[in-house]
């Protein structure tokens, strides 16, 4: 390795300036000298350490943080150019590569967009070229994306920092402030998944939108950034992801799930009609309080929907509208829900539980395995 570095000073200089293609060239020289016995990932890591290389990848996906205001006053997704310009201004001494993984407003987020982001992150980690990754995204679906990346990449050896902005980059300093802290966090941390917003470093789990400019973590006694569970452990061993396959798996998962919220006047019959003629397998229900619901024999009872779902082999996963720990053991109304096989998702918020479902869908080989994984996580994230 040292011979390859010594004999190729120009390639090393380019590498130290943040252009990563010489890393493959130098790694190839080492592999040739060792007749293929060296491990490419280890070689890349050693070269980076030897040359003191610290490259941050910024993966952009759109949102207000890179959006533009049109002449008619409307807002549309921009491109990564503005983020590259801002990053060069706020972190001129940090080698940074900006990569686009789609440009859309966060309310337009679809499973295929997640697939592109997941594959891009995985590729940067697997290549051994990233010392940190910053992901920019819109605020409306930030709670879902942050949790998804936590479930998948919390065991990664590269820190991943997600950030966003509620205002446009040319109309406020919010994007600049958040990007600066995101880059600093990605440069400082060794691993884990983080969210940077409003001058704070937050956990990606149970991320809750309070109001423009403010996110917080609900229902956590301590912030969680690492070791989310078995899915992340399994995912960290995958080095080559096919984007089409990931997109198909996520699309299939979205087709087989449904989400509803209890409210005064909730009528099971409306949902039963949908469930009888659909391929839905997993249903998320936002319950009242710690898991209460109407389980009487009235027209406004949840019970008929649970019974219909059970007959069709569907699974019910419950979260709390009040964002508190679900506990079916106290209220008599919760006992009835539990009796029908509904699974309380502990202290996970709806967004984190739904993101967990998508993460498990990428690793499960069958509905039965998916059900088992979800129940194991429910137990793991219950107080």
Where are these predicted regions, by residue range?
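Active-site histidine-anchored catalytic micro-motif
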Residues: 54-383
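Charged, compositionally biased, marginally structured helical/coil segments
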Residues: 1-53
């Amino acid at each position: 390795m040292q011979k390859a570095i010594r004999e190729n000073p120009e390639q090393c200089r380019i590498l130290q300036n943040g252009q990563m293609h010489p890393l493959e060239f130098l790694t190839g020289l080492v592999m040739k000298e060792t007749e293929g016995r060296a491990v490419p990932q280890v070689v890349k890591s050693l070269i980076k350490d030897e040359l003191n290389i610290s490259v941050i990848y910024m993966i952009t996906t759109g949102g207000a943080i890179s959006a533009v205001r049109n002449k008619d006053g409307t807002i549309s997704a921009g491109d990564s150019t503005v983020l590259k310009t801002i990053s060069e201004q706020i972190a001129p001494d940090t080698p940074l590569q900006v990569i686009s993984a789609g440009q859309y407003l966060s309310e337009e987020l679809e499973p295929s967009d997640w697939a592109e982001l997941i594959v891009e992150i995985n590729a940067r980690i697997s290549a051994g070229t990233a010392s940190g990754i910053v992901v920019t995204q819109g605020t409306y679906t930030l709670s879902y994306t942050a949790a998804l990346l936590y479930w998948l990449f919390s065991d990664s050896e590269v820190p991943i920092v997600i950030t966003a902005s509620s205002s446009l980059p040319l109309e406020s300093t919010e994007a600049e402030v958040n990007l600066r802290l995101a880059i600093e966090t990605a440069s400082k941390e060794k691993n884990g998944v983080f969210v940077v917003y409003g001058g704070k470093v937050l956990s990606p789990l149970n991320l809750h939108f309070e109001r423009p400019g403010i996110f917080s973590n609900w229902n956590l006694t301590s912030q969680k950034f690492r070791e989310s569970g078995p899915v992340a452990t399994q995912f960290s061993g995958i080095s080559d992801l096919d984007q089409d396959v990931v997109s198909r798996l996520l699309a299939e998962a979205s087709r087989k799930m449904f989400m509803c919220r209890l409210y005064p006047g909730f009528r099971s019959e409306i949902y039963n009609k949908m469930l009888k003629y659909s391929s839905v397998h997993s249903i998320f229900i936002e319950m009242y309080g710690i898991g209460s619901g109407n389980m009487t024999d009235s027209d406004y009872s949840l019970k008929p929907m649970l019974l219909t779902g059970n007959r069709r082999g569907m699974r019910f996963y419950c979260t709390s509208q009040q964002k508190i720990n679900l506990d079916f053991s106290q209220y008599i109304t919760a006992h009835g829900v539990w009796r029908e096989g509904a699974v309380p998702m502990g202290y996970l918020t709806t967004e984190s539980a739904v993101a967990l479902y998508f993460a498990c869908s990428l690793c499960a080989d069958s509905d039965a395995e998916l059900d088992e994984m979800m129940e194991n996580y429910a137990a793991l994230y219950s107080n």
